[in-house]
């Protein structure tokens, strides 16, 4: 599988990254190890995780995904694996350092704990899972100045990362769920103060949420920050498994097996919106008309985007994982690509 260099780093990663958010909740340790083995047999060398996983996050399972990866990783040649993890941002999970800010002490503690769970001496790419500051993320469409709060500065966060790079505990730094302002500020602060420069941004990108194209595409191109695209299947909506009815009258299927039925409806409301389901149904119809599955259409389309360095895929079975990887070999016709743009123009970013 072709490798891509991330940002200005020397990390060379596969065009597909294995996401692991199901390990420890929807997948057992043995199943997680099987997925890792299969992914690497197909040429994937890139794993993404975070201290917070698995999802849905809860105190009882906190860190389980990293522990599962760790028992696999200790049996592998370490230089064969490009490992990415993240530090949780503030205010969402009170069981993670009391939900506190991204202070230097918090970042250092998070790295030390992740290294123990992962059974490794270093993490190749360490990412800030979401901003410490007030920012429009996770389905919030507009910035709200009334939600401003005190938080650790970007300079303080990068200083802590710099200490960890010098100590050999992390190699490169990235951000996640960021905005054009955030990317620009991280790059400017790093260059102004001689601190680690972010190599990557990990943001959602899929057929029902193309918000990356609203300024982040140019920002990342000009700052040489690589996109790691997560949720390419729109939390599973783009597979069609959550839909019943026809393309004109799609209905959510509560009996489907997956994340959107396993967890409470408020877990991912943007993927449950009527307009999201309407768009997903249209993409299903398009995929069927061209002899492919909804998953293959959604992933092949992501794999074809010029600004995506690596697409993060996740699965709960080896069959799903195989289909997701196989989609890399599907080239979408000009007719299909034009149809995608027509649907997008009619139902614009419903899951943003």
PLM segments and residue spans:
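Aromatic/hydrophobic pocket-lining residues that form the small-molecule binding cavity
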Residues: 32, 65, 107, 111, ...
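Active-site mouth loops of central-metabolism enzymes
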Residues: 20-30, 93-105, 145-152
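Short beta-strand segments at enzyme active-site cores
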Residues: 46-50, 83-86, 122-128, 174-177, ...
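Beta/alpha (TIM)-barrel catalytic core signal, keyed to glycine-rich beta->alpha loops juxtaposed to Asp/Glu
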Residues: 131-342, 347, 351
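N-terminal binding-site loop/beta-alpha segment at the start of enzyme catalytic domains
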Residues: 1-86, 105, 112, 121
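Active-site groove signature of glycoside hydrolases
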Residues: 116-139
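Residues at the N-termini of beta-strands
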Residues: 15, 46, 122-125, 172, ...
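Surface-exposed, active-site-proximal loop segments in enzymatic domains
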Residues: 58-63, 89-104, 134-143
